[in-house]
């Protein structure tokens, strides 16, 4: 199996349910044709560098997957016939260096930063300290 990354941009006029349906459809195409999805990034709504089909914004998605080369033709065919796709690209990672870079991208996408613990306010800590001081005395 080869390592791939695909990025596609959906029209900004779609509602959330339609966006999820399109994303699930493309994931299903990859899985049905023997691919293994490693991770999927929803990059959200972003401004386009230039106007595409009278749209200035679009929903960006990136999918990292492993598959046989024959899957790419089917995936690109589905991208082309879907009118909600503004642009798409499929990138193949061939060399060992590229494959290790692909793996680091997948790891970075899967390891989302955890929220930092909030510090307790002095007001919250003070009553507890007073109670402990009173019980010790």
UniProtKB/Swiss-Prot annotation:
Q: Name one GO molecular function term.
A: small ribosomal subunit rRNA binding
Where are stretches of biased composition, namely Basic and acidic residues?
Answer: 111-137
* Key words of the record: Ribonucleoprotein, Ribosomal protein, RNA-binding, rRNA-binding
In residue numbers, the region (Disordered) covers 104-137
GO BP terms: translation
Reply yes or no: does the keyword Cell inner membrane apply: no
Signal peptide start-end: none
Listed GO cellular component terms? cytosolic small ribosomal subunit
Q: Which family does it belong to?
A: Belongs to the bacterial ribosomal protein bS6 family.
Function comment: Binds together with bS18 to 16S ribosomal RNA.
Name recorded for this polypeptide: Small ribosomal subunit protein bS6
Q: Which gene encodes it?
A: rpsF
